[in-house]
Amino acid sequence: MNTAPAPARPAQLLALDWGTSSLRGALLDAQGAVLDERAFARGILTVPPGGFAEVFDASFGDWARTGVPLCLISGMAGSKQGWAEAPYCPCPAGFADLAGQLRWIEHSSLAIPVAIVPGLRCESELQADGLPPVPDVMRGEEVQIFGAIRHTGRTNGIFVLPGTHSKWAEVQDGRVRQFQTFMTGEFFALLSQHSLLARSILADAPFDPAAFAQGVARARSGAGLLHNAFGTRTLSLFERMAAPALASYLSGLVIGEELRARHLQPGAELVLVGSSTLVQRYSHALSQHGARIQALGAEATWAGLHALAQHIDHHDHT
């Protein structure tokens, strides 16, 4: 007896992560499972003025015309340089707050309703000596945080998103209450490629866990990155560290400096969201501080957009 194949699950959401240098998309079913994925080197910096709708149609137009009811876009597509500015949503913010501040795109060529997710903004809490607060922002990471909340079921705690600009977010009752940004990845790139240290560092050297751990430990000494970074040069100068290990040592220094600034307590529980390479390094560093880690990867973005879609009444925008 022949059994008919199961019908294909219909897509319920076209989810896009449109960043500075890349464009990723996924078709999700009603449960948030990924039906198909695509990626292009078409970040917002590659799109000419007025060209976003054309790039969208060339990249995902066939998906948009299959009957999927909604497209949600996170990332830099909502910046001033993007498709349409989606102003930052103030913290504390949860799913409903983001859903209420979506930027809906009006364009005759679009086959389905398209909305851009706003980023988040907050004000620094610690004002020493009466200094005014300093604003902080994120755009794209908020979706990863809410995806991690949905994926882990944790509605309270600290969520860490390593990257060029790492984010540490405090989540309370399922809402982002406060966060801090650290320019860790950017500082590593500047020091390793455009400073005195670039003469010593081998950019393509393999990861050295021992050298990385030594850098994290040195950062904990409290001397500060401005002093410790110069040690990368002198360790090479006096041949106390092999050249292939220097990049890992410097990586440990800058990540360790980020952790030192957070004053982590032993046993701290953190949710870590990011690429496998960065999650591995931060896990190594955080273990030296006695932290306990729950890690997630790229699936957090799709989980966040799917969860956000459940809070949207998009029929008013069709």
Predicted regions and their residues:
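Adenine-nucleotide phosphate-binding core of ATP-dependent small-molecule kinases
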Residues: 218-259
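Short glycine-rich, Thr/Ser-proximal phosphate-binding strand/loop in the N-terminal lobe
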Residues: 12-51
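Glycine-rich phosphate-binding loop plus the immediately following alpha-helix
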Residues: 47, 121-218
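Short beta-strand-loop/turn "lid" adjacent to the catalytic site in phosphate-handling enzymes
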Residues: 63-135, 173
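Glycine-rich phosphate-binding loops at beta-strand->alpha-helix junctions
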Residues: 22, 267-285
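Short glycine-aspartate micro-motif
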Residues: 13-17, 70-74, 157-161, 271
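Glycine-rich phosphate-binding/hydrolytic loop that grips phosphoryl groups
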Residues: 294-318
